[in-house]
């Protein structure tokens, strides 16, 4: 990528992220890492890099960047584990994979400062993962995506979108609901187009002219139907409607999940939200933040019937899409539920959801609003170990469970029933009281009570990730902050987990031990 484009991307990203995440409990360094790492991922994934031995200065600079992003209080304790992944067709993703090793067996290096060089791995652990081909050409142009949002929000969202959208061929239609005339913002639109081009995103901007008497978020979102019809492409097999905080783990996997359905027929495909409370309130529909998908024949019918459907508006886009489908189709096109699309209308500590071992995992929503987790950074693992390893649970011999890209948890009193979801969350905004067993029964199954953090459950949470040379390795940093009352000797604690595909000479000490997961 040209230096000018990188500077433009960094400037736009910094401004946009500041405006959108002002009220989100994220460390500023985490988003500095995101802005810097996304261009690195793109450039290194499109051209091969010649591995070279890392110098002490290179290692020190990389360590310094990571430590600054973590917001640690020195001195701190540090452990490091390295995995050498081996993609194989013999392995499939399951809810829980057993690894024949003690993850925390090596005592931590204690009392490190921010200026110390982080200790290297003593060995590399070989781990089989589901097969993927990082060199395979990606073409998901048959999937045409659309989002209704504001100019500032799409500005902030493009870097995260690029994690899963760059270079795929899928067009992104952006309905700018705060811009009735794009000519009035020609310079700003031009900068957004340049930003998207640098990120290899095929983007289309469309203005929105709402009714001055009656307008709503629902009408704005449903206006995508006519916009899709205006920009229809002959190769489109599916239209996908998303929110600006919808994150796809893998667009090829998403398109593969739609393969059983004939796009020449009318289809309305999506997922319910997690809690029975909201389903009872809003009815049976595809929730928009999880992403939902409409076949071309049905989209054409909805676009042609837009004027007839607008009076049905109740204020929410996904409700209006459903009600229009009910109004104009005969026989009625009913919702087809697709597992793996996740609305995540959950509040509070949602670690129980992330650590529940859900599969498939196609989309994640609300990751920067109702809750915060650096999903774009967490997803770096997919470029090195494949999409099926993202949020995969690995259980180790020492009663430790790593949810890849989210957390490392030690259970001092033995493993709980990991087949049950830990009920750490509530079902609505600002609700602290945990719901009853039946609230999530249809979506998550039976649950178990939340464990006492620090006593029954000791957790390190992913706070930062960065690629190594040629995007053939990724460094993950899981952090446990010191808690008042833990004792005078308690410190912030970091577990670095490094993953590599192939050998990167000089980066790690590779005394390989086979700890292949039993899947």
Spell out what each predicted region is.
Residues 1-84, 88:
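N-terminal signal-anchor transmembrane helix specifying type II single-pass membrane topology
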Residues 2-7, 403-519:
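Extended non-globular C-terminal regions
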Residues 5, 246-334, 338-348, 352-359, ...:
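Conserved catalytic core of nucleotide-sugar-dependent glycosyltransferases
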Residues 137-140, 159-172:
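Short, acidic, metal-binding catalytic loop of nucleotide-sugar glycosyltransferases
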Residues 142-152:
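A conserved hydrophobic helix/loop-capping motif in glycosyltransferases and polysaccharide synthases
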Residues 176-237, 249-252:
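Active-site-proximal specificity loops/subdomain of glycosyltransferases
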Residues 238-242:
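Short aromatic-hydrophobic micro-motifs that form the base-stacking/packing surface
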Residues 368-429:
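Charged, amphipathic alpha-helical linkers/stalks
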């Amino acid at each position: 990528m040209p230096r000018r484009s990188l500077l433009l991307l960094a400037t736009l990203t910094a401004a946009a992220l500041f405006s959108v995440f002002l009220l989100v409990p994220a460390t500023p360094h985490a988003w500095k890492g995101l802005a810097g790492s996304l261009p690195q991922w793109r450039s290194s994934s499109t051209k091969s890099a010649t591995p070279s031995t890392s110098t002490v200065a290179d290692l020190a600079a990389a360590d310094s960047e990571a430590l600054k992003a973590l917001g640690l209080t020195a001195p701190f304790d540090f452990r490091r584990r390295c995995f050498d992944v081996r993609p194989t067709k013999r392995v499939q993703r399951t809810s829980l994979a057993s690894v024949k090793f003690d993850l925390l067996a090596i005592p931590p290096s204690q009392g490190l400062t921010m200026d110390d060089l982080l200790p290297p791995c003593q060995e590399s652990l070989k781990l089989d993962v589901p097969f993927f081909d990082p060199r395979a050409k990606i073409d998901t142009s048959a999937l045409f995506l659309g989002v209704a949002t504001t100019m500032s929000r799409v500005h902030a969202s493009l870097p995260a979108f690029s994690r899963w959208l760059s270079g795929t061929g899928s067009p992104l239609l952006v309905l700018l609901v705060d811009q009735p005339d794009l000519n009035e913002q020609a310079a700003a639109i031009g900068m957004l187009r340049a930003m998207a081009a640098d990120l290899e995103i095929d983007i289309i901007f469309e203005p929105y002219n709402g009714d001055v008497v009656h307008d709503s978020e629902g009408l704005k979102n449903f206006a995508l139907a006519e916009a899709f019809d205006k920009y229809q492409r002959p190769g489109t097999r599916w239209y996908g409607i998303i929110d600006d905080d919808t994150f796809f783990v893998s667009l090829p996997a998403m398109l593969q999940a739609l393969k059983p359905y004939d796009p020449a027929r009318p289809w309305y495909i999506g997922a319910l939200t997690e809690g029975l409370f909201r389903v009872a309130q809003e009815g049976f529909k595809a929730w928009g933040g999880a992403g939902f998908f409409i076949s071309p024949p049905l989209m054409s019918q909805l676009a042609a019937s837009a004027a007839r459907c607008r009076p049905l508006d109740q204020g929410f886009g996904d409700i209006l899409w459903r009600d229009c489908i009910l109004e104009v189709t005969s026989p009625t096109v009913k919702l087809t539920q697709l597992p793996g699309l996740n609305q995540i209308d959950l509040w509070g500590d949602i670690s129980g959801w992330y650590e529940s071992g859900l599969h498939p995992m196609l989309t994640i929503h609300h990751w920067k609003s109702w809750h915060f987790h650096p999903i774009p950074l967490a997803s770096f693992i997919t470029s090195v170990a494949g999409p099926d390893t993202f949020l995969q649970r690995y259980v180790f011999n020492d009663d430790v469970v790593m949810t890849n890209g989210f957390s490392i948890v030690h259970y001092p009193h033995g493993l709980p029933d990991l087949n049950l979801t830990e009920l750490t969350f509530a079902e609505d905004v600002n609700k602290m009281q945990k719901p009853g067993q039946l609230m999530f029964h249809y979506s998550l199954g039976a649950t178990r009570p939340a464990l006492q953090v620090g006593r029954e459950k000791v957790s390190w949470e992913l706070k930062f990730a960065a690629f190594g040379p040629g995007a053939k390795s990724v460094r993950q940093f899981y952090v446990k902050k010191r808690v008042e009352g833990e004792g005078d000797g308690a410190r912030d604690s970091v577990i670095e987990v490094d993953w590599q595909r192939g050998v990167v000479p000089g980066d790690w000490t590779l005394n390989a031990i086979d700890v292949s997961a039993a899947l």
